[in-house]
Amino acid sequence: MSLVPPLPILSPPSSNSSTTAPPPLQTQPTTPSAPPPVTPPPSPPQSPPPVVSSSPPPPVVSSPPPSSSPPPSPPVITSPPPTVASSPPPPVVIASPPPSTPATTPPAPPQTVSPPPPPDASPSPPAPTTTNPPPKPSPSPPGETPSPPGETPSPPKPSPSTPTPTTTTSPPPPPATSASPPSSNPTDPSTLAPPPTPLPVVPREKPIAKPTGPASNNGNNTLPSSSPGKSEVGTGGIVAIGVIVGLVFLSLFVMGVWFTRKRKRKDPGTFVGYTMPPSAYSSPQGSDVVLFNSRSSAPPKMRSHSGSDYMYASSDSGMVSNQRSWFSYDELSQVTSGFSEKNLLGEGGFGCVYKGVLSDGREVAVKQLKIGGSQGEREFKAEVEIISRVHHRHLVTLVGYCISEQHRLLVYDYVPNNTLHYHLHAPGRPVMTWETRVRVAAGAARGIAYLHEDCHPRIIHRDIKSSNILLDNSFEALVADFGLAKIAQELDLNTHVSTRVMGTFGYMAPEYATSGKLSEKADVYSYGVILLELITGRKPVDTSQPLGDESLVEWARPLLGQAIENEEFDELVDPRLGKNFIPGEMFRMVEAAAACVRHSAAKRPKMSQVVRALDTLEEATDITNGMRPGQSQVFDSRQQSAQIRMFQRMAFGSQDYSSDFFDRSQSHSSWGSRDQSRFVP
């Protein structure tokens, strides 16, 4: 029966504690349930009832006296302040329940453990309430359980670690999680009798209690601390990525614009070429330019001013379509039977030429260049690439090339009818007819004009001579070896300093031979020498001639002037021709030759002017540029034809262009008085 009094004694303290605790209890629920205002009424029974139910079993005999003393005892009041300073009261409550009820209190500890997140969340709305209430709730637990003071030393051990992380670092995340604990806490006190109700809530609160523990608080410390950093790094990274992506897109756009412009420049649909009116000795229309383009099967035809259709070669056309561009040395050696003497076609300044037959049965001419060596391979390829793009009816087509250790070889189409030099000067050859000579002169002029004005880049031949004018079976001229002088010079410059002038004696222009100045006019001079060969039938340098007449140009200069003035060609024309020529065509050819071999390069005509002069013999085209052969003064207009006077008046601004003038000019024209007949091949 002595046990009965303690129970009533315990109940008064509990009531006293309840009476004394209401202020703290009202403050205590504020700490966990500050966010929801509805929780204060159910919360007061939250902490005392479980304490009353759990504490009686252990301290039934010993706790009554201390239980009555603690409520008024000031020591209890004094003890909380250190707890407030060191750690919040929840840790004290954490330590006391576990020993009291191992079975029923585990739900309560998570409930008591869960309030720490609300204080973590509560500091943001009411910061002062979180600091003041904890000392007041602390008296009630120690008053009810004096026996746990032995265990209280253990909480301070975790408490030093807990206060710093909980109050300082956890505020941001708990607000989202603190909503669930308050909602669960009021439900638990509302159902005090049934203990099973907190049990289903425990798993929900355990994940919440994990972040609030000492170790979990450290985890929380890392999470919030890292999340702002991640957000900051994320924003900076996003900005950097955006800048990089913008630069990439900008570079792609610039590259696209550049490629489109480059493609427009190299568009195979735009064809450029040399426009030539139909000639009396030209081949059928459209055959002036042959295009070998692997990209387009049939290049478009463009109509010239005279109404004739001409095919134009593209500047970026590659090698001959559907054919190889590179050959091995062994293959070319096999094709030419080991470069045997029986296959030797000739030998020139750049090397020997051998005849060969490819595996597909195509006949080719293999030129083995004297220039070689391992150096200069890049320059050789560059020049070969330029040459391979040149395709014209009057130019020999380059089929391919070979670069070996010490060898450089070029493969051309084989032209079966030998060279102009062979047909003009070889002993025992039949005399070339005048019509054949005119055809050869016109074709060679077209090919050289194409090199000078329509190739990109323009090509200066540097070694135009009769042995480089090849003839096919119909005696159409094809210019060979163009670009080789440039290749030789580039390759020589890589091995040693070369100052030698490319060319053949007797064909070289005087300014090029003396000073090395190179221009298109040097090729014009060489072509003039070829015209003199066609007219006279003599070699450029003939040692069998009397002293002083070895040079063809120097011997022909005075005769050219006399032939133009007197229209007498007997002393100048090839004796083997006799009178088998057309005077009008002979006059025009003599005039063109005299203009091409002038001493002054500036006074020489362009090859396009020579082409027009040879193609339009019935028209009055002035290619003399107002100069007599061998003179350096301007023609006197009173001594010239009416056409020249008309051009001078147009040039110097005369406005007298009446019909009478044209009538007089046509009636007194020196060209009209001359009996001209158009030659039809």
Swiss-Prot record:
Extracellular side: 1-237
GO molecular function: ATP binding; protein kinase binding; protein serine kinase activity; protein serine/threonine kinase activity
CDD domains: STKc_IRAK
Ranges of Low complexity composition bias in the record: 177-191
EC number assigned by the record: 2.7.11.1
InterPro entries: Kinase-like_dom_sf, PERK1-13-like, Pistil_extensin, Prot_kinase_dom, Protein_kinase_ATP_BS, Ser/Thr_kinase_AS
Compositionally biased intervals (Polar residues): 214-229
Keywords: ATP-binding, Cell membrane, Glycoprotein, Kinase, Membrane, Nucleotide-binding, Phosphoprotein, Serine/threonine-protein kinase, Transferase, Transmembrane, Transmembrane helix
UniProt-annotated binding residues for ATP: 345-353, 367
Compartment list: Cell membrane
Annotated positions of the Phosphoserine modification: 467, 498
Active site: 463 (proton acceptor)
Residue positions where Phosphothreonine is found in the record: 499, 504
Main location: membrane
Reaction catalysis annotation: L-seryl-[protein] + ATP = O-phospho-L-seryl-[protein] + ADP + H(+); L-threonyl-[protein] + ATP = O-phospho-L-threonyl-[protein] + ADP + H(+)
Pro residues bias spans: 1-11, 21-163, 192-201
Family annotation (Gene3D superfamilies): Phosphorylase Kinase, domain 1 (3.30.200.20), Transferase(Phosphotransferase) domain 1 (1.10.510.10)
GO cellular component terms listed in the entry, alphabetical order: plasma membrane
Assembly behavior: Interacts with KIPK1 and KIPK2 (via its cytosolic domain).
Annotated family: Belongs to the protein kinase superfamily. Ser/Thr protein kinase family.
Protein name as annotated: Proline-rich receptor-like protein kinase PERK8
